């Protein structure tokens, strides 16, 4: 996928609500997410890999991984508002992508996370 097309698709996602500074929430713009995930793809090749998006926010990085061919993405998010946006963004994907996504509501470091050997 071309960087411009990936950036445009990611820019259409509902943005992260960024309401809780105690969770160190930051929004990632579509252009940055696209170039970052394309760099990861060039280094490790996302196609066929299992990815975990910790502190997923609106899901922009994990969704990019799905668009670049990741086999499955587990999105981990603790914030209720961000999880709502994340679920909305995943539901807006076509079925071929959304069925390869799992959302876990968990606080990293506080909740017990069982992840099935992610690659990335």
Model region roles, listed by residue range:
Residues 1-50, 85-116:
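S-adenosyl-L-methionine
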Residues 40, 69, 90, 94:
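Active-site catalytic pocket residues across diverse enzymes, especially alpha/beta-hydrolases
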Residues 49-57:
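Conserved class I S-adenosyl-L-methionine
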Residues 58-70:
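Conserved SAM-binding loop of SAM-dependent methyltransferases across substrates and taxa
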Residues 72-77:
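Conserved SAM-binding motif I beta-strand of class I
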Residues 81:
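Conserved Rossmann-like nucleotide-cofactor binding loop
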Residues 118-120:
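Short SAM/SAH-binding signature in class I
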């Amino acid at each position: 996928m071309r960087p411009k097309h990936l950036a445009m698709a990611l820019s259409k996602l509902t943005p992260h609500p960024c309401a809780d500074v105690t969770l160190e929430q930051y929004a990632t713009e579509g252009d940055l997410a696209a170039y970052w995930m394309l760099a990861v793809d060039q280094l490790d090749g996302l196609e066929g890999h299992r990815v975990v998006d910790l502190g997923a926010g609106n899901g922009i990085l994990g969704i990019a991984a799905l668009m670049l061919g990741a086999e499955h993405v587990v999105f981990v998010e603790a914030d209720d508002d961000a999880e709502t946006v994340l679920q909305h963004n995943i539901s807006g994907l076509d079925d071929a992508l959304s069925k390869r996504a799992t959302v876990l509501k968990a606080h990293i470091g506080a909740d017990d996370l069982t992840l099935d050997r992610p690659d990335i």
